[in-house]
Amino acid sequence: MRSYLDFEKPVAELEAKLEELRALGARDGAVAIAEDVARLESKAAAALAELYAALTPWQKTQVARHPQRPHFVDYCDALISEFTPLAGDRSFGEDEAIVGGFGRFRGRPVCVIGQEKGASTEARIRHNFGMARPEGYRKAVRLMDLAGRFGLPVLTFVDTAGAYPGIDAEERGQAEAIARSTEACLALGTPNLALVIGEGGSGGAIALATANRVLMLEHAIYSVISPEGAASILWRDAGRAQDAATAMKITAQDLLRLGVIDAIVPEPTGGAHRDPAAAFRAAEEAIAEGLAGLDGLDAEALRDQRAQKFLEIGRKL
């Protein structure tokens, strides 16, 4: 069953009427409603396209958090063959908020790492809603070290509200783990490419997104803090999250203009959750193009390009 966001109410009403018409036609085939169905389909599609062509930053935030939006494991299943996951950081334990391993992208061996939020209640609890603890980031470092040793490109998929802020995570060195993961990204002698597929929240995101190429899905967001968190700090009112979302420039379109990301990956009309297969195809093409542009660079050039990219962001912003 499709889940609608609050601003999608006009589209929801049209599609509900459309389903009623289809059900009527299924019950009584003699009823000539084909033209009515076609007309309503066209009207609903036009309304959806018009709505999504002018989303506000806050509406994009809602789309990025949509409960039916494809998660990392969905992209991994669609894009990576022969995927073999690795577990544990070889220091403390396993953290399922970050899933990673090795597989093939279009037949090419790669290392794949992603933040997984989980689709069901049970999965969300198991994956801690995509909020990684230190062992998750240390597992990512372990995987990147292996990728560097074997000369494999690293693909990272970012989808997190932020690193887990619990006391246990702080006691085990959360800040240090995030810093080490960021350092490992910068030190890689092989190409790395990051794709923000949903939320890119704070240090929890940058720990996997310090890459040669940083891509974002059209309706993803990427920021130093959530809109609610920013509103609470700036105005002492989380209810002003919409104002914060606009002020922080968190959308893919704003971040491309500012030079923080390298490219925007288009989503199907209505968001990736409406047509996951189309979203996977667009992501595949963007990743393939990004890797092709890095293939001619040696280890030193890759590190230098990566470092200069982020130094330039610091100078400009």
Curated annotation (Swiss-Prot):
Residues 39-293 form the CoA carboxyltransferase C-terminal domain. It comes from the Bacteria. The keyword Aminoacyl-tRNA synthetase does not apply. Pfam families: ACCA (PF03255). Its main location: cytoplasm. Keywords: ATP-binding, Cytoplasm, Fatty acid biosynthesis, Fatty acid metabolism, Lipid biosynthesis, Lipid metabolism, Nucleotide-binding, Transferase. GO terms for molecular function: acetyl-CoA carboxylase activity; ATP binding; carboxyl- or carbamoyltransferase activity. Pathway: Lipid metabolism; malonyl-CoA biosynthesis; malonyl-CoA from acetyl-CoA: step 1/1. HAMAP family: AcetylCoA_CT_alpha. Belongs to the AccA family. Component of the acetyl coenzyme A carboxylase (ACC) complex. First, biotin carboxylase catalyzes the carboxylation of biotin on its carrier protein (BCCP) and then the CO(2) group is transferred by the carboxyltransferase to acetyl-CoA to form malonyl-CoA. This is Acetyl-coenzyme A carboxylase carboxyl transferase subunit alpha.
